[in-house]
């Protein structure tokens, strides 16, 4: 069930990312189209598209969706070691996506900071969408990192402790090794985003 919920979240974020991609192409093809899409909007679309597709879409689809289905199946476990932690992890990611979507409706719109998201660049650059848009984006990142860390630890413990009898680490399928390695690398990178977001907030 959690895997299906992750897939549905990935579909939703993918649709939002697709719409933002169309709007960016519209701005590039017809600059300043009737004043509907300005340069500021373009920067906001680029930033949000990158965040949604790279962080939320790919993680929800491959690690959340396929990981929840493939890991127990391939290691011979009935389910993840901590199913309730798995459920809590999903809902934290879901709330993170909801908070990020809320930044579209605040005054000034979502952040358009790009790579100047973190201080002191945000203050110096005066980027579009600064203020509430950036704060909502960073709160969303913080929730996502906490939820993903909980889910990642659950994945790792399942792979290391819930394998079927006779399955050594050397006999594990390469797909499990791939998901395990990607989870470890992501868990090394995402806490840095969390620390920077907490410093900003």
Label every model-predicted segment.
Residues 1-2, 18-40, 44, 61-89, ...:
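Membrane-interfacial helix termini and the short, flexible loops that connect transmembrane helices
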Residues 9-18, 89-107, 181-195:
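Hydrophobic alpha-helical membrane-insertion segments
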Residues 47-59, 127-148:
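Hydrophobic alpha-helical transmembrane segments
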Residues 51-60, 82-96:
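Hydrophobic alpha-helical transmembrane segments in multi-pass integral membrane proteins
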Residues 137-154, 188-197:
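Hydrophobic transmembrane alpha-helices and their helix-loop junctions in integral membrane proteins
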Residues 199-201:
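Conserved small/polar residues in nucleotide/adenosyl-binding loops
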């Amino acid at each position: 069930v959690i895997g299906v919920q992750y897939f549905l979240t990935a579909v939703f974020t993918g649709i939002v990312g697709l719409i933002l991609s169309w709007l960016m192409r519209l701005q590039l093809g017809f600059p300043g189209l009737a004043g509907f899409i300005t340069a500021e909007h373009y920067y906001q679309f680029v930033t949000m598209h990158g965040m949604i597709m790279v962080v939320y879409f790919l993680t929800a689809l491959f690690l959340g969706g396929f990981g929840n289905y493939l890991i127990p199946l391939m290691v011979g476990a009935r389910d993840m070691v901590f199913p309730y932690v798995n459920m809590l992890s999903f809902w934290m990611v879901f709330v993170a996506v909801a908070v990020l979507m809320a930044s579209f409706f605040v005054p000034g719109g979502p952040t358009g900071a790009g790579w100047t998201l973190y201080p002191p660049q945000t203050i110096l650059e005066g980027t579009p969408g600064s203020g509430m848009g950036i704060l909502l984006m960073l709160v969303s990142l913080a929730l996502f990192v906490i939820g993903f860390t909980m889910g990642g630890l659950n994945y790792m413990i399942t792979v290391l402790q819930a394998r079927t009898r006779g399955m050594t680490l050397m006999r594990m399928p390469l797909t499990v090794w791939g998901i395990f390695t990607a989870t470890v690398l992501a868990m090394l990178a995402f806490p840095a985003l969390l620390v920077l977001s907490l410093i900003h907030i």
